[in-house]
């Protein structure tokens, strides 16, 4: 069953909470909130203060993984520095999920192109993974996507 994705054109912390309520779900356990923390020198991310009401509402932990491309988040040390520079680690509990090797390998049954996916092994500590993403298309649009439980 495909996931539902909710959008809003009103870019405000209150709108994010309304999107969460529209999902009709209560996240439980250790709630992992995946978002874009921003690259060094780039202002194209929504600040910790923007996300504060949502993250506090679900008692969440901000989670990310190191990037596979050059930048300020491609090593754990650089990623932690970026999290500090952008205020994330001061505002919330943060978990860089692939900080410790090896990655967790998830099998994809009947995968046509990919048969396994490597993810940060801290994913197993999350009772409710969720993703908060921002998109640009004509205007800035914000979405909240509930990814569901993993096995």
Predicted features by range, described:
Residues 1-151:
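N-terminal and secondary-structure boundary signal
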